[in-house]
Amino acid sequence: MPYRGSYHFAADGDPERPYAGMNIPNSLTILRILLIPVYIGLLVYERFDQALIVLLVAGITDALDGTIARAANQRTRLGAFLDPLADKLLLTSGFITLSSIHLIPSWVTIVVVSRDAMLLLGTAVAEFTESNIDIAPTFLGKGTTFLQLAYVLLVIFLSSHHMDLALLSPLLIGMMAFTVSSGLHYLYRGYRRAGSPAS
């Protein structure tokens, strides 16, 4: 079955190249996933400065894997799956852990995780049914990711310096507005595309 999308992917399902999917970009993505338990542990023990360093390293690997994949034409189906998964796991684990140590309100994390679960379910259904549903990122989706990351980073940074988290109230309001709006937009777009004939 051909991969849906506009990118040309390196063959990672070739039986003569069983490890073709394990290139440098994908290895960097896997490293990012492996850093998540370290990141969670540092947050739980409130070693916020070290947690920020781990986030910085994760961010560097995120930038490098995409750059290398494009420059060396090493984009694969495995990478297309793992890269957003790693980003989402990193963000979600941050929200859940920071809520567990009472630095982020639980309701915020519930909204964030519920939106992500809805998108994950929609993506899985689209792949399973081979539906004509466009799951490409939108402006709202990218804005949501940026604001969520900024919020988590600043919560950790302010906590490491014992500063008042109420300073982030305007950012929190904006982040939640984007989170809810993007979730509803993806839901609406998926509903419309699901009812349209396949192209």
Q: Where in the sequence are the language-model features?
A:
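Alpha-helical transmembrane bundles and membrane-interface segments of multipass inner-membrane proteins
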Residues: P2-S199
